[in-house]
Design a protein with these regions (language model features):
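Short, flexible coil/turn micro-motifs enriched in small/turn-prone residues
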Residues: 21, 26, 57, 65-66
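N-terminal helix-turn-helix
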Residues: 34-65
């Protein structure tokens, strides 16, 4: 899955949305360790600080958990992931 960035909206919000899609689709399953900020930023072609901002927002939303010694993982709360999946489906239907 490639990264799609457009100029119309803040990059970090687009990265956050794309990470959510990767989590709910199972690309990054529940409990899985995510690649490093630097690796994700390199893959997306963005500044690591921008990627960090997107990932911090995922932490705040409860979709990821950061552990200082072992990095960042997807939440094991499958209910939270399912809620996000339903939100995405609802937004698609509204369009």
């Amino acid at each position: 899955m490639g990264w799609k960035i457009d100029d119309g909206r803040p990059i970090w919000t687009q990265l956050k949305e794309q990470m959510i899609k990767r989590i709910v689709s199972g690309t990054y399953p529940s409990g899985e360790k995510l690649p490093s900020v630097r690796d994700l930023a390199g893959e997306a072609g963005v500044n690591p600080n921008t990627m960090q901002r997107a990932l911090s927002a995922l932490d705040q939303d409860g979709l990821t958990i950061t552990n200082r010694t072992s990095g960042r993982c997807v939440t094991e709360d499958v209910t939270k992931i399912e809620e996000c999946r339903k939100d995405i489906a609802h937004k698609i239907v509204k369009q």
